Amino acid sequence: VTTRSSLEADLAARLDSATEARWMVEEVLGRRAAREHAVSDAVVEAVAAMADRRLAGEPLQYVLGTWAFRTLELTVDPRVLIPRPETEHVVEVALRQLRDTAPSRRDASGPIVADLGTGSGAIALSIAAEVDDVIVWATDADRDALAVAAQNRARVGATRPEVAERVRLRMGDWVDWFGALPATLEGGIDLVVTNPPYVSALEWIDLEPSLHQEPRSALVADDGSDGTPGFAAVEAVLRDGHGWLVPGGSVVVEIAEHQAHAARTLAGALGYRDVRVERDLAGRDRVFVGRR
């Protein structure tokens, strides 16, 4: 008889990772199954198929089909980028800016946030889950990615419907980053937050192979008008974003380390105030912040 314990042990040896083995078994069996719980042939086959995919080089998050991001468990598959710790830090910075900005609103409504290029919905849903009265407009230019965001909104909504109903999904495009938003929001957004494509086409070639399995359109951007590699999307958000923010509203953008100088320079020219770049957990310039 195959038990959960023996299945995990066999899988750990095959994957050379006890942690990944445990996660795969938990994904199929659930976390509450006892160590000596007898498992069916169907479970053994399902776990073996996951191991095959992992050994073929597929990212662990796609193999599992779910991944934790801050307080949420999200559906993740090859239609969207894998949520990363750097982006959790982006949310942390965004929440801090929102706490500082929102009290300046003249009306009694809660803060309004735009998450551009939402992908899995990780940023939008996290902000909605952690700020009680916020409305988050989440856009993406990729229909498949937006479908994953909708799945995750439903997933969160199954236990926290009040969170899901405050996230509005909109189909956008790569040319006009703000075009999917209702025109009535222009000049009225408290926070624009985004993890846009910021890898240049040349840089993409040299990325580790597993990153090539993630959607290229969510990673790769043209160079900026000043020649900064991969900067075009960040530049577009900064150029257009100023007019969409309320006075005192913030823009928070995940960037590549080498784009910090270009982002600061452009933001200064566009009239942003309190411009800074925060470092990620590895000490790299990663999160651009500015106020209207």
Predicted regions and their residues:
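Short, low-complexity, intrinsically disordered N-terminal peptides in bacterial proteins
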Residues: 1-16, 42, 99-110, 158-166, ...
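N-terminal auxiliary segments of SAM/dcSAM-dependent transferases
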Residues: 1-67
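A general structural signal for well-ordered alpha-helical segments in protein cores
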Residues: 4, 8, 21, 47, ...
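Hydrophobic alpha-helical packing residues
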Residues: 11, 95, 127, 153-156, ...
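Short, solvent-exposed loop/helix junctions and linker helices
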Residues: 18, 41-44, 81-85, 227-231, ...
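Glycine-rich, flexible loop/turn motifs
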Residues: 35, 56-65, 72, 77, ...
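SAM-dependent Rossmann-like transferase core, predominantly class I methyltransferases
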Residues: 49-150, 171, 177-180, 289
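S-adenosylmethionine
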Residues: 134-135, 139-292
